[in-house]
Amino acid sequence: MTIHDLAEYEILDEHRVEDVQSDGFILRHKKSGARIAILSNNDDNKVFYIGFRTPPEDETGVPHIIEHTTLCGSKKFPVKDPFIELAKGSLNTFLNAMTYPDKTVYPVASCNDQDFKNLMDVYLDAVFNPNITKYEEIFKQEGWHYELTGKDDELKINGVVYNEMKGVYSSPDEVLSSQIYRSLFPDNTYSKDSGGNPEYIPKLTYEAYLDFYHKYYHPSNSYIYLYGDMDVVERLEWLDKEYLSLYDYKKVNSEINKQPAFDEIKNVEAQYSITMDDSQENKTYLSYNRVVGDSLDEMLYQAFDVLDYALVSSPGAPVKQALIDAGIGDDVYGSYDAGILQPVFSFVAKNANASQADEFESIIENTLKEVVKTGINKEALLAGINSSEFKFREADFGQFPKGLLFGLNCLDSWLFDDMKPFIHLECLGTFAKLRKAVDTDYFEKLIQEYLLDNTHGSSVTVKPKRGLGNEREEALAKELSDYKASLSDEEIKKLIEDTEHLKKYQEEPSSDEDLRKLPMLTRADMKKNAMPFSNIEDELLDVKVVRHDIESNGIDYISFLFDAGDFAQSELGYLGFFTNALGLVSTEKYSYTDLANATNIYTGGISTGTASHPDIKDRNNFVFKFEVKLKVLEKNLDKALELMEQMLLTSDFTDTKRLGELVAQIKARLQANLSSSGHLVAAMRSMSSFSRYALYQDELKGVAFYRSICRIEKELSESPKSVSDKLAAIAKKLFARNRMLISFTGNNEAYGNAKPSLEKVIAGFNKMSAVGNQAEVHFNTAKEAFIDASQIQYVAKTGDFICEGYEYTGALRLLRIILSYDYLWINVRVKGGAYGCMNTFLRSGESYFVSYRDPNLSDTLDVYDRIPEYIKSFSPDERDMTKYIIGTFSALDTPMNPEAKGSRSLSAYLEGITYEQIQKERNEILNAQPEDIRRLADLVEAVLKKDSICVIGNENMIKESAGLFENVEKLI
């Protein structure tokens, strides 16, 4: 039987989607009206999703709350948290759900056929038959609820989505984004935040929430996607029989209307919170925003990505440089959102002065007029096109399956035209047209039409306000106090009973009967053997080469690593700045603008970074490298190496104006990252009180690096030459053959072809640079808190089990899954209301527990301290134990692209990890019994006894717990 024989479906279109090596089908389910798009190919990492068009009508976050709650039990699978049960016990390569401004999507992926079928079944039952209509507690837990534990206690609001969005709205970047869409689309759905504004989330009633679900969650409003190597006919037959045939077509009014264009540009102002003692100077965000056509225009869809690069995102781009030269903003960047009906293009200046708003706008417009008049730099356009095309062809999305990203890309057009799911995947022809257009005035006309003459736009200014977060907290506290005062004794009693009832509901585990309804694999389904490493040593001109014989589709992945272990701790801040500046300053032959363009024209990117590797055999031997990575088509290797050589050996650090621009940009981006990635920052900072690895991470990327950048900024203004000299000295010290190691990922033929080019570039480096002993370090304080203007916390507690005499085993990988998806999930997220909580045990001994967007502080630390007690009483049955093992294997066996396989092999080489070790750990996981986990209780107790904590978050919460900390200071 073929897809053409399925009477239940109408084939609307079928054709070869050559650009993604797939056979494409567009179907309609006749009875229900469900839309189906299929990309059939030989990729065994199969992907499924079902999505719904879900336009919000207000700011209560109802689409977001439904996304959370549909995965809290269903008719066929009534367990309370099937999402977590699947995370524990499936071989998924992706498992999540996402709320967008206009749609909600539920994707899964797996390389295992039976697992893929299981995941599809659970997700489809979740969206069509969720338990949300039976249990209001689900809505309260994930959305919001009043919390009152005693009649004299303070009335509070809690809920996972509520706390998540409090964290989101603590970020000025997010405030700016929401205000941009509100300003541009006042009359359609894009003016409403689908995620929810914490001010309005508590206005959502259970009834309105259910109404939204019943309105939009129907097959007639659905978008179903299948990708990969599967029996498509079998899947479609099953889909019809089990779900779609149960529904008749229903007219669902979910269409998104276009926003009529404005007659004039809108001006909008908003505020974000900073702490009471923060300066308000140069903390304003300025934006220039325009609506650009519609998302069904294939040329515009790609062209404005190219214009983003050519006008503002690339080093020295004209709009960026004009604003920086005028002293407007520390960081200037572009933003292009093509995933909505009417795409939006923005220029943004971060850390500007509010008084510069008019000048900001006039500089942008004058620069654009000049660009239109004189023409855009053709090299910049070609660089932008090549960069986009290289990324598309490589299809490297890190840990995410490429089929998932292809599927999400489909929705950028499919949501607005049932016949056009694949138009943005068939883009190689578009890139060819854009290349031809470089020699015409096509791009200049786009600028004139959409950025200069277009009145459908806005200027949004977001200003800082001291203590705004505290004002909102106080206003909420008063509102809740007044509300409580208005209640009768009976109503207060009811609130207390509701709070107790919800806690009991949360504490009551799913029954064994319900748990057994969830489909599950067996231990026999697990791959017995670990993925091998590929490390083959070679030597070129006395430089060691580690090559990884891996098929890489004609792309060479090369890393040049330089020993940096003798850099003093006081030098690490400068090394961090050097890492960020290299490739963004001029060289002997290239201006920094031309260098960036040439890099993007001839390569898939040249990046710099640092890599820290503990030596598993010798704990005192810490491997610290400066790393330069490049990816390039074999035919362009010589050019790529020439560009890299220019960067490493001839970079000009005497242009202190340029250094000042880079310092300001790094500082601005760090300010955003320290808050948005607060969980990782807190974990590393906490471990930096005892771990060299974590200390280096903090010095090069975390709180210490931010402090160093602030000092370097001051030094540049007072003694610019000293900064230039230090950067030049780093280059001279680092880049020598005796410090060099080369990693090459590609097949044997590719390496053979590359050897002459590699030898040529090696010969250009000095032979020797004095290498000192491993530097001494001074660890940070063990108990710290950092205050920012957010309304939530990131709470970390860390330790080191190797120092306490324990060894790393595969059982620790298993314990991480058990804690993440059981104990921590239930106590920190479900009961505590935090958005997330995670833990890790590294081979080198460092371990952490950390929460994410957490309304609590000391309560979360108490949860961590009770972990050993939980482990001691751990007694799952065989089915549950197998589930944890399967979930652990899911993380172990994530599919990898060629670059990732090479990086994995290189890390093992540098850390002294053998295949025998990882196979032993794999066997320990596969054969683990409950007693193996219980034996880890003492190890975890030793980790927690280190009592190293770090909290980033709300000022009032930190001050209430001030006794926990030896050091409390502002984060930024």
Q: What is each PLM-predicted segment?
A:
Residues 432, 445-533, 671, 680, ...:
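Long, compositionally biased intrinsically disordered regions
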Residues 158, 210-242, 723-758:
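Non-catalytic, conformational "gating/processing" segments within enzyme and secreted inhibitor domains
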Residues 45-55, 81-129, 136-147, 174-199, ...:
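M16 family metallopeptidases and their MPP-like homologs
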Residues 1-47:
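Non-catalytic terminal extensions that flank enzyme cores
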